[in-house]
Amino acid sequence: MSDGPKDDTIATVLIRDATTDDWPAIYPFFRTIVDDGRTYALPVGLSVDEARRVWFEPAPWRVFVAIENGVVVGTAKVGPVRAGRGSHVATASFMVDPARAGRGIGAALGHYVIDVARSLGYRAMQFNAVVETNTSAVRLWQRLDFRILATIPEAFDHPDAGLVGLHVMHRRLSST
């Protein structure tokens, strides 16, 4: 996730299921975010096809896009954190076009994906790798009731800060 609003702003964007036809609009900011190396532990320099396979995972994964004035400005995906007996817990990933960061698009996607995960029957949501220096994402997830369960020290090689921790964050989606 590359974006978090500076306050409690939530953008007014259309969020819908993505199709592979959306990939040409997603890939430029996907590549910018991944190659920047500050928020995602993915290899730098993924080809268009490699990146598409990373983002568009097969069912039961769902991928969404946020649209503002006809332009794809963000994307998210949600699916099970584990197969089998762990499939009742969701995980998700989020990206917002860095040119549109700080406007609440990440918050809008976050709320949307939480609602979708709940409607799909997931009982909780867990993020396994929130970079601790990505403070806008950490703040956003905490505002959306995620708690930091643990921080894995020196698990992420940040291009400026060196070895930093990865937070495992969690929130319940059901009341039971």
Where are these regions (language model features)?
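Terminal substrate-recognition subdomain of acyl/acetyltransferases
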Residues: 2-11, 94-95, 129, 152, ...
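A short beta-loop-alpha structural element at the N-terminal edge
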Residues: 13-26
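Acetyl-CoA-dependent GNAT
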Residues: 17, 39-99, 110-112, 116, ...
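Hydrophobic alpha-helical core bundles mediating ligand binding, dimerization, or RNAP-core interactions
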Residues: 26-30, 34, 48-51
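Conserved beta-strand-loop-alpha-helix junction that forms the acyl-donor binding cleft
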Residues: 101, 127-137, 155-157
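Conserved acetyl-CoA-binding loop-helix of GNAT-fold acetyltransferases
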Residues: 102-117, 139-143
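Conserved GNAT acetyl-CoA-binding A-motif
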Residues: 117-130
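Conserved acetyl-CoA-binding loop of GNAT-fold acetyltransferases
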Residues: 142-152
